[in-house]
């Protein structure tokens, strides 16, 4: 066993659109983490720095204790608090793995798989652009693609019929183009009411989507259960949830077929391992939410590698800058699968020079409908 050590300092980096952290130990071990939700990295950075005062001088191995102390001291919760706690949790697990010279998944029960099936984001403002991107990704080896079936100006449709017809046409075109060898995942992004999403879901049944994601706002598990009951397609939801308690309500309501915890928001590796176990008891599989940097991807793969009820991994592509610049050696992607790394901790190393890249902050851009009202994105 390595000699005991203490946390020396915590560093934060606003890198492009993401928040990365490093936790330094007195013995020289450095843990890497990522936290926050897209668009709110600055306040999450401030929260990490606030929590760092407590962490300095503490034993990094007491991961659950530090989470509980900080969580209970916060009084008021939410995405900023949980984003900071998630970043810290991931970095502390990275430290533990590095100090013990084993991958994180070895510390969480051991490996359940050697590679992780990914679904790739595809898009296009026109139907032809969407189809072309889906075909391109299928040719690259991906066996699942995910897309929004609406144009970017979806909120300017004059009628529900026009909106739904366009969605059905786009989903059908993608399915026909990629064939039975590629699963399609339909993302609604909470842009519909329960009634609208039920009617659209029924029309999409013919295309056998792998999942129907966030067909309405996730705030009401009871209403989400209505959508699940009245559509003969699997619902996937949960990316906005920050605690195990929200997932418990969702699962108790039988409101989803897949859960989508975000490791950088829902308590890090510790929190999402708990969520996965809760879902396992309901025979529900896990599709981790992953719209952030390669650090988030690496954390997701560690979780995917040690749970029995993994289904798919969200993947947005990391072969082009700035993402391709962040790691010394990127995770191996082959035929739409990420290889589970064997290195200690997260199994990655940051390219220190890349951390100099400036922040690219999100601009608030809520869409406005024809009547002047704000729309969900």
Predicted regions and their residues:
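Extended hydrophobic packing segments that form well-structured cores
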Residues: 346-377
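Metal- or metallocofactor-binding catalytic centers and their adjacent structured scaffolds
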Residues: 24-100
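Shared catalytic-loop signature of beta/alpha-barrel
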Residues: 49-53, 62-65, 202, 208-211, ...
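Structured beta-strand/loop patches that form or line metal/cofactor-binding pockets in enzymes
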Residues: 1-32, 36, 318-324, 373, ...
